[in-house]
């Protein structure tokens, strides 16, 4: 449940209506995060740009959506955000994730057969970032560099905070 009310489609704010129009056009829908942020549409606009670049593969064209979703879901789980876990689990399911796969992300993903070595490296990096332990685990970046380009590592890092 949001702490602020969601801005509705019938809002009097022309700026919020334009923001919603952009979301529908670029993302296919208006997320609850945007509905809350629409109280300040000018501040919300860059968030939409980030969401588009992070979630639409045809925009960045660099990192597979599956890897992005794994990273986003791991971060949600580590933060203990039930809403985020539910929302991002649905994203995973829409990409074909099995329930066991979703469960494995929160457990011992490193020994799971669900994930490739590259995916494990991305999930581990997200874990190190979220828990602020990346300096204690230099091997996490070394593993990433085995499988991903610098541009892909930037995307993994950015969606870890999504």
Identify the function of each model-found stretch:
Residues 1-62:
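Mobile cap/lid helix-loop segments that border enzyme active or cofactor-binding sites
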Residues 44, 86-104:
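Iron-sulfur (Fe-S) cluster-binding segments and ferredoxin-like electron-carrier domains
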Residues 61-78, 154-155:
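Immediate flanking context of iron-sulfur cluster ligation sites
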Residues 64, 98, 149-150:
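Helix N-cap / loop-to-helix initiation motif
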Residues 81-84:
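Short cysteine clusters
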Residues 107-132:
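Short Fe-S-cluster ligation motifs
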Residues 125-128, 140-148, 152-153:
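Amphipathic alpha-helical interface segments
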Residues 150-162:
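Preference for long, well-ordered alpha-helical segments
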């Amino acid at each position: 449940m949001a702490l602020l009310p969601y801005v509705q489609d019938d809002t009097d704010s022309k700026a919020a209506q334009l923001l919603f129009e952009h979301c529908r056009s670029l993302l296919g829908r208006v997320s609850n995060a945007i509905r809350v942020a629409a109280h300040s549409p000018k501040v919300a606009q860059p968030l939409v740009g980030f969401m588009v670049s992070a979630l639409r593969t045809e925009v960045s064209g660099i990192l597979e959506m599956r890897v992005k979703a794994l990273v986003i879901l791991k971060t949600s789980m580590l933060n203990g955000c039930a809403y985020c876990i539910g929302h991002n689990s649905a994203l995973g399911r829409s990409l074909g994730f099995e329930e066991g796969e979703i469960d494995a992300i929160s457990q011992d993903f490193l020994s799971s057969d669900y994930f490739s070595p590259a995916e494990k490296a991305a999930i581990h990096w997200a874990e190190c970032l979220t828990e602020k332990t990346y300096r204690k685990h230099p091997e996490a970046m070394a593993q990433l560099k085995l499988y991903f380009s610098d541009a892909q590592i930037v995307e993994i890092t950015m969606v870890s905070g999504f």
